[in-house]
Structures are given as structure tokens and as C-alpha cells.
Amino acid sequence: MWGDIDRKFVNSYSDASVNTLTQQFTADIRTFKLDFGAQYTAKLSAKENITLGVTFSPAHKIGGHPELKKILTNSQTSVSDTTSYGGGFDLSLPNTFGVGVMWSHNDKLKLGADYTLQQWANVQFPTFETVSGASTFALRDNQFSDRHKITLGGEYCPSAFSRKFFNRIHYRAGVSYATPYIKVNGNDGPTEISASVGFGVPIINVFNNRSFLNVSAQWAHSSAKNFISENVFRISVGLTFNELWFSKWKLE
């Protein structure tokens, strides 16, 4: 994983004699992320089985060498003063744990539940502070909270190999609840509740029976105490394709 972070905050005033303050936070990420997982399926009966899964992503430093620049400018005098802080420490990713279970009946009905924990409370993040006239930009604790996410979902397909088109469609629905990991002025950020419905249309021919055109609609609501709430509606269209699309015939 790689990328640049560049955030800029500008405080300007209508009075030209007052200095404009620009704060610029930058970091350059060049690192990796490891994900481990295990899965086991147990047969409950001739038509039922249950699948258990666990995942783990270890915490590690991702570099970045974050830097903060404070720039004071005056439009009347054209004088600019820049002070730089930081650059000698690294950002980090948290430990992430996941566990899930899925129950399947006759390859028609599937119900599942997932739980994910991201241990952001153990992650330090750089902040700027001025104490007794001394300004510092350094890594500090208690900048985040642990993030918990619970997801419930299901899928129903009347008959995957039926001659009738609508019997081969996969109908899906799900809900989720997630707590925030960010803090705003020391308060927890917005929690998020979401719900989605959708369907997968199989693309079937003599060479391919595992490709799907997926369409879904999602509603997400985020809110926090003393903050505005937000409602978001999304429409997603995707294609899950079979690797046989890229195969070529070979005659000998």
C-alpha cells in the first residue's frame, strides 16, 4: 500500500492587516499490509452445513515521516514565515481481528454474521500542542478509540441450475453497525448504521456458470452527539467474473 497524505487548514480574515495562518500536514506512505485467515466447514446434515472463519491483520509501523508546517503570511507586507515540525517518527496500523459464521441450507439459503475489531486505541498519532510557550508536534496516546463492527446478511437462490431465469437470481440483504475510531475534540466520532439489498444475475453459457452481474442499493446513517447526522444512499453495479473468460483453446 502506498500514497500521500496532504491536509491543509487555512485561517484567513477580512482585515488585510491580520496574518493568515496556514497549517499543512503531509505524510508519504510506502508499506505493506498482511492479512491472515482460516476457514472450516462442518456438515450438519445432508442439506445443511456451517462455516466458521477467522482473520487477523497484525499491527505494524507504516512509515510516513509526518510533517507539520505552520505558515504565517500577510497580504499587506507580503511577508511569509514558515515553521516546520516533525518528520522523525512513523505512523502505525492497528491489530485487526475478525470472526464470522455462515449457515447454509440446501445451497439455497445462506445466513451469516461477522464481527470485526480494530484496536485503534493502542495507536499513537501526531498532534501539535503548545505548553508553557513551548510548541511540539509528536506522537501521543488517546487519539483514537477501538472500532467494533457487526454485520448480518443473507442470500437466497431458488435454484442455481433452473431453466427459469428468475430462479437462478441470487437475492441478497444485509445490515451492519459500526462504532467510530476517530475522535473530534476529545469526543467520539459518528457511529454508522447501514442496510443494503441487492441481487446477482448469473451470466451462464456452456463455458461459464460462475460469473455474476451484481446490483445493490445501500442506505447508511451516521450520527454523533452534538454533531450533525448524515444519510447516504448508494447504488452499486459490479461484475464478478470467472477466470475461464481469459482461457484460450489449445489444440495438439
Indicate where each model-derived feature is located.
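Outer-membrane beta-barrel porins/channels
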Residues: M1-E252
